[in-house]
Curated annotation (Swiss-Prot):
Assigned keywords, A-Z: Methyltransferase, S-adenosyl-L-methionine, Transferase
InterPro entries listed in its UniProt record: Methyltransf_25, rRNA_Ade_methylase_Trfase_N, SAM-dependent_MTases_sf, Uncharacterised_MeTfrase_YrrT
Gene that produces this protein: yrrT
GO cellular component: cytosol
Lineage: Bacteria, Bacillati, Bacillota, Bacilli, Bacillales
The name this protein goes by in its record: Uncharacterized methyltransferase YrrT
Native source organism of the sequence: Bacillus subtilis (strain 168)
GO terms, biological process: rRNA methylation
Enzyme class: transferase
Induction (free text): By methionine. Repressed by sulfate and cysteine.
Role, per record: Could be a S-adenosyl-L-methionine-dependent methyltransferase.
Residues reported in the UniProt entry to bind S-adenosyl-L-methionine: 53, 74, 97
Record-stated family: Belongs to the methyltransferase superfamily. YrrT family.
Length: 213
């Protein structure tokens, strides 16, 4: 359920905001347009939002600034602490993950996440989408931004390119985490009654908007 990556985020928490600002050259392209990507998620979201993997609270803050009600689910204690400090009590960030989490204190009309869904295996992704499909009402939506590849060949090319650039940490991440392809995600969402569309944001990240039919 992605919890095997908690030690990574415990270590990364203190420097995560510097990374998303493009200060780590290996991840600069993945976070190119970061603020624009988060703003796009906010625009596509409804009024009551369930957020998975808020990390240090960057998307959460933008959602709250837009007047939305937010309930955050974050498995990393270090990330929860940073998010709580950043948000100054404006909303609650609780322990949980994409599959196991406390029930929100409201009925969410949108489920969002940024840079996190790839921590689930394909089987777990499918189970999560199924769970959300049962929870959401007609016309509610899922809006995720994450690294996705057009196909398996593009995935391998990204790994090879990272290695050729000397970006060995990035290459290792690409090889050990569970990055999906567009076709795989489309099949998962469609199987659970969602109409989904994908919009590319940079060489790595796509926004997926899935509307419950």
């Amino acid at each position: 359920m992605g919890r095997e990556f908690i030690p990574l985020f415990e270590d990364w928490a203190a420097t995560y905001d510097q990374t998303v600002q493009g200060l780590d050259i290996q991840y600069k392209e993945a976070f190119r347009g970061y603020d624009h990507i988060l703003d796009a998620i906010v625009r596509k979201s409804g009024t009551h939002v369930l957020e998975f993997g808020p990390g240090t609270g960057n998307l959460t803050a933008k959602l709250l600034d837009a007047g939305k009600t937010v309930f955050g689910i974050e498995p990393s204690p270090a990330m929860r602490k940073l998010a709580s400090d950043k948000l100054s009590g404006r909303t609650e960030i609780v322990d949980g993950d994409f599959l196991t989490f406390p029930e929100p204190p409201f009925q969410a009309d949108t489920i969002v996440s940024s840079y996190a869904f790839h921590h689930l295996t394909d089987e777990e992704k499918r189970a999560a989408i199924k769970q959300y499909g049962k929870y959401l009402h007609l016309h509610d939506k899922i809006v995720f931004a994450d690294t996705v590849f057009e196909n398996a060949q593009a995935y391998q090319q990204a790994i090879d390119k990272a290695r050729s650039q000397g970006f060995y940490q990035l290459a290792n991440d690409l090889e050990t985490e569970h990055y999906p392809t567009l076709d795989a995600l489309k099949e998962m969402f469609t199987a659970e009654g969602f109409a989904v569309r994908f919009t590319q944001q940079n060489d790595f990240v796509w926004i997926m908007e899935a509307i419950k039919r």
